[in-house]
């Protein structure tokens, strides 16, 4: 499991950020505490322009990006749970429980936001739209989360990440935003790669 692997690696803390849901949070927290590891509960939310919109066309499809939020404390956990629940109750489209920026802003207290991976808003804008638009989005997240907004640097061996990281670091320098190193982990050992591919 994630927790036993973290213990083997002498990690003081470990985070769980499942896509769109928090089903594993209770078991994860219990296991982490049993192993004397600090659990960080998070969620990688699907963020749409309007979570309530249900009608789309080929020319105007449902556009959504991934957004990692981490709970700082119990209140943050409750806000994260509200966001995740609203995604299913109000924003479910197909298999995607969606939230939007207005809802995130409403429930932002005691949550940490990261710039995210290539499937997140700011990296997507850097690569596909322009740095000006990416900087505008960066400033929105910074204005909302202030000191609880962090740049996430990824290195999965994907060439596009180098450009994203360089641009994010320049934004960080300009606005005084701190950064963390993170990689998405979908399994704990490379021997599990084939099983993960089968699940996909």
Where are these regions (language model features)?
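Phosphodiester-processing cores and adjacent nucleic acid-binding clamps
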Residues: 1-200
């Amino acid at each position: 499991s994630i927790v036993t692997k973290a213990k083997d690696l002498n990690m003081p803390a470990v985070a769980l950020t499942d896509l769109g849901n928090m089903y594993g949070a209770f078991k994860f927290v219990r296991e982490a505490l049993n192993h004397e590891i600090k659990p960080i509960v998070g969620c990688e939310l699907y963020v749409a322009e309007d979570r309530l919109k249900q009608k789309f066309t080929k020319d105007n499809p449902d556009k959504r990006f991934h957004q990692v939020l981490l709970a700082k404390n119990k209140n943050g956990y409750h806000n994260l749970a509200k966001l995740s629940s609203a995604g299913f109750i109000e924003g479910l489209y197909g298999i995607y429980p969606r939230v939007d920026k207005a809802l995130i802003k409403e429930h932002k207290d005691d949550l940490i936001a990261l710039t995210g991976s290539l499937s997140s808003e700011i990296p997507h804008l850097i690569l596909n739209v322009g740095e000006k638009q990416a900087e505008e989005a960066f400033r929105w997240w910074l204005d909302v989360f202030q000191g609880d907004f962090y740049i996430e640097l990824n290195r999965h061996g994907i060439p596009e990440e180098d450009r994203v990281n360089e641009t994010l670091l320049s934004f960080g320098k300009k606005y005084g935003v701190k950064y963390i190193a993170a990689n998405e982990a979908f399994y704990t050992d490379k021997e599990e790669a084939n099983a993960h591919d089968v699940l996909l």
